[in-house]
């Protein structure tokens, strides 16, 4: 009994220390970034968030193009990846066991591909395809340039191409969560839905997804967090222009690609501004996590769970 009690206390202490270490590391990252970016915040204040200037020679800096680029590419990635992940998950779960297993492994392998490989594929394969076929089809045939924020000028690079790359990269993460949600749904729910005449689409959309909405939201926010911080793949295809984009086909930049492009030779005020961009990115990621937990809490309360 004494040995068991002692081991429980040791285990509790170790777990507490690990949990505290996570909090200390997170706080340490944030404090270090704030301290390193203090010169930028004292010089520009909140104006840094709304300025689009970027002229290191005259010490004019603005984070708005990077923030907009990060947000737009992430939204494009989610809009593309979510329906694909949902359709792939449904097919994998409903397919014969061996077929579903092979397809599941194939989707999971996408997560194992290094981001630099995605970037090279985007540079040498996707960007030329975008310039020659996809973007002309979207503009000339579908006439999508009439939609706000879809411009008629394109060169294969830009926000849309970066969003497509990110969609492929976050697809396996969202798909894995959705597969688990679909597989954990009690069979009686499906049988009841089919029994009252629901189609397969209606059963999955109105019954199963609602039952596993917490898992679905978790998968969405996992993909969102993954897309926000991606650097190398985006760096290859976004165009790396420190200008405010006028459309999704414009070359632009993201926070992470701005850091990768400028940090090596930056010093003085520019280095402090780059640390400030790191603070902004960290706050965006923390905001996503807080929002996801809030959504899950609200959903849990609506379902009457404790």
Predicted regions and their residues:
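Transmembrane-helix boundary motif in ABC transporter permease subunits
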Residues: 3, 77-107, 292-298
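Transmembrane alpha-helices
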Residues: 109, 113, 117, 174-178, ...
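Transmembrane alpha-helix signature in integral membrane proteins
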Residues: 61-91, 220
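Cytoplasmic-entry segments and transmembrane alpha-helices of multi-pass inner-membrane transporters
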Residues: 12, 87-122, 304-306
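Membrane-cytosol interface at the C-terminal ends of specific transmembrane alpha-helices
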Residues: 86-91, 142-195, 199, 207, ...
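C-terminal transmembrane helix and the adjacent membrane-cytosol boundary/short C-terminal tail
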Residues: 179-183, 187, 261-306
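Membrane-interfacial helix termini and adjacent extracytoplasmic/periplasmic loops
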Residues: 42-61, 118-168
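Interhelical loop and adjacent transmembrane-helix boundary motif
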Residues: 234-282
């Amino acid at each position: 009994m004494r040995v068991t009690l002692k081991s429980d206390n040791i285990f509790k202490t170790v777990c507490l220390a690990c949990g505290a270490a996570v909090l200390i590391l997170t706080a340490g990252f944030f404090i270090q970034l704030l301290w390193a970016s203090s010169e930028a915040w004292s010089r520009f204040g909140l104006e840094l968030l709304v300025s689009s200037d970027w002229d290191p020679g005259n010490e004019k800096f603005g984070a708005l193009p990077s923030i907009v680029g990060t947000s737009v590419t992430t939204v494009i990635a989610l809009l593309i990846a979510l329906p694909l992940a949902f359709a792939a998950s449904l097919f994998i779960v409903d397919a014969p066991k061996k077929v579903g297993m092979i397809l599941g492994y194939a989707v999971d392998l996408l997560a194992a591909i290094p981001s630099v490989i995605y970037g090279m594929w985007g540079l040498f394969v996707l960007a030329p395809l975008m310039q020659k076929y996809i973007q002309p089809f979207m503009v000339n045939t579908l006439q999508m340039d009439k939609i706000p924020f879809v411009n008629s000028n394109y060169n294969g690079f830009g926000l849309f191409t970066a969003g497509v790359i990110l969609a492929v990269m976050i697809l396996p993460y969202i798909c894995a969560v959705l597969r688990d949600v679909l597989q954990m749904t009690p069979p009686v729910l499906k049988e009841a839905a089919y029994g009252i005449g629901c189609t397969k689409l209606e059963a999955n959309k109105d019954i199963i997804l609602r039952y596993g909405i917490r898992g679905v939201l978790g998968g969405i926010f996992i993909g969102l967090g993954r897309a926000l911080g991606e650097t190398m793949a985006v760096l290859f295809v976004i165009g790396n222009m420190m200008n405010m984009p006028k459309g999704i086909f414009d070359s632009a930049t993201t926070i992470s690609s701005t850091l990768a492009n400028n940090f090596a030779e930056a010093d003085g005020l520019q280095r402090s501004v780059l640390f400030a961009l790191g603070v902004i990115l960290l706050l965006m990621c923390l905001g996503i996590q807080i929002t996801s937990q809030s959504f899950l809490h609200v959903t849990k309360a609506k379902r009457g769970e404790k």
